[in-house]
């Protein structure tokens, strides 16, 4: 048996970069609740005792940036200086400006269907049938591990846990099929008073075993739990955090290509975000319809232009119909113009803060995960 290994990582909601992402998206959500036509590009920087919120925002809404920031940090769990960051005492700097009118004139149109892209760029969407959520297994289970860490921290099952954590899972494949998990890494911030051996046992029993399927674990599986032996200093004290620095964690864990644009803090007129969601929607429906076992979609745009400059499909030799037919079906059933995809996926709603931790894809509560095009694609293909 040949064994190919593939690894993906995730980070918890208390990781500094994810704190920044969640603040940026919390600001976006608050504005969208009041102004559906707002233009938002909100960036956040966090470091010891300080949060700086900046970017370009054009809106008629008024939101309390300080209150939004403190509530977000508090809900993550940073509530005392003992753990290195305190929602109630950190300094908050607001350096937000307005979006350039040069961009506005290229995006806004009298006919909204002709709305231009907010920038040039290329975006990818991906799906695979190796999990029931049509996502690669390594990133899926890496997310599950850090999500479980947050759960047992917040419900006090493991009260000595702190918000910052990272996971990494290496899967073994034989000719593209999962045959096991080769390695698991989980590093979690903790209080001073927990012994390393007690931490290792508790993490194994309360986080790893409840999450990872037993049939994929064996005596060959390697476990690395807090491998440095100590992780007391974490969060923004340990590292500064910036919006948009976890773009592979946010997407497919390296299993698919990435156009380079981050998501958090951007309203749906920014195709970096909305077109990446639409490309995932297209790829997932193609795989769910049985047109391919794996599918990667690339779309590209020019600033101020409505129609995509390109649509391409990669199926890695797993297609069940010709790729030309798949592209034809995409053009028939999916409107990938900026306004079209916003309408198609109902993107102008305050749903974005919850995307900002544990991945933007493979979570069925989001509209771009719907499988409502499957029957139409089947009818057109077979």
Curated annotation (Swiss-Prot):
Q: Name one Pfam family in it.
A: S-AdoMet_synt_C
Q: Which residues form the signal peptide?
A: none
How the cofactor is bound: the record states: Binds 2 divalent ions per subunit. Binds 1 potassium ion per subunit.
| Enzyme Commission designation | 2.5.1.6
Entry keyword NAD = no
Q: Which reaction does it catalyse?
A: L-methionine + ATP + H2O = S-adenosyl-L-methionine + phosphate + diphosphate
Associated pathway: Amino-acid biosynthesis; S-adenosyl-L-methionine biosynthesis; S-adenosyl-L-methionine from L-methionine: step 1/1
- InterPro entries (UniProt xref): ADOMET_SYNTHASE_CS (IPR022631), S-AdoMet_synt_C (IPR022630), S-AdoMet_synt_central (IPR022629), S-AdoMet_synt_N (IPR022628), S-AdoMet_synthetase (IPR002133), S-AdoMet_synthetase_sfam (IPR022636)
Residues annotated as binding Mg(2+): 17
Show the GO MF annotations: ATP binding; magnesium ion binding; methionine adenosyltransferase activity
Q: Which domain of life is it from?
A: Bacteria
List the GO terms this entry assigns under cellular component, sorted alphabetically: cytoplasm
PANTHER family tied to this protein: S-ADENOSYLMETHIONINE SYNTHETASE
Q: Into which family does the record put it?
A: Belongs to the AdoMet synthase family.
The record's HAMAP family line, in alphabetical order, gives: S_AdoMet_synth1
Query: What's this protein's name?
Result: S-adenosylmethionine synthase
Question: Origin organism of this chain?
Answer: Psychromonas ingrahamii (strain DSM 17664 / CCUG 51855 / 37)
Q: What is the lineage of its organism?
A: Bacteria, Pseudomonadati, Pseudomonadota, Gammaproteobacteria, Alteromonadales
- State the encoding gene: metK
């Amino acid at each position: 048996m040949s064994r190919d290994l593939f690894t993906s990582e995730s980070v918890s909601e208390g990781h500094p970069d994810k704190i920044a992402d969640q603040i940026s998206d919390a600001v976006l959500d608050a504005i969208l609740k009041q102004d559906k036509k707002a233009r938002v590009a909100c960036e956040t920087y966090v470091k010891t005792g300080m949060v700086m919120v900046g970017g370009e925002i054009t809106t008629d809404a008024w939101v309390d940036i300080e209150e939004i920031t403190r509530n977000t940090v508090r809900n993550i769990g940073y509530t005392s200086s003992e753990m290195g960051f305190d929602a109630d005492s950190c300094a908050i700097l607001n350096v937000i400006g307005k979006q350039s009118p040069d961009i506005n004139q290229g995006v806004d149109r009298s006919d909204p269907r002709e709305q231009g892209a907010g920038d040039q760029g290329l975006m990818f969407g991906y799906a695979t049938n190796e999990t029931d959520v049509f996502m690669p297994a390594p990133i899926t289970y890496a997310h599950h591990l850090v999500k479980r860490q947050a759960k047992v921290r917040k419900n006090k099952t493991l009260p000595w846990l702190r918000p910052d954590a990272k996971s990494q899972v290496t899967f073994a494949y034989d000719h593209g099929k999962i045959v096991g998990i080769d390695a698991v890494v989980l590093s979690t911030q903790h209080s001073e008073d927990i012994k390393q051996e007690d931490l290792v046992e508790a993490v194994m029993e309360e986080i790893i075993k409840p999450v990872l399927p037993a049939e994929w674990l064996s005596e060959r599986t390697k476990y690395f739990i807090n491998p440095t032996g100590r992780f007391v200093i974490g969060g923004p004290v340990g590292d500064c955090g910036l919006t948009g620095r976890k773009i592979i964690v946010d997407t497919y864990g390296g299993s698919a290509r990435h156009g380079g644009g981050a998501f958090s803090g951007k309203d749906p007129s920014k195709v970096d975000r909305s077109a990446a969601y639409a490309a995932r929607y297209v790829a997932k429906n193609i795989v769910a319809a049985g047109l391919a076992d794996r599918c990667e979609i690339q779309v590209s745009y020019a600033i101020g232009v409505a129609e995509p400059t390109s649509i391409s499909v990669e199926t890695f030799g797993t297609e069940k119909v010709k790729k030309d037919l798949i592209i034809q079906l995409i053009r028939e059933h999916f409107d990938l113009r900026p306004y079209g995809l916003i309408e198609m996926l109902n993107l102008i709603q305050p749903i974005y803060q919850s995307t900002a931790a544990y991945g933007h894809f493979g979570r069925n509560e989001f509209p771009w995960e719907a499988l409502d095009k499957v029957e139409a694609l089947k009818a057109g293909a077979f």
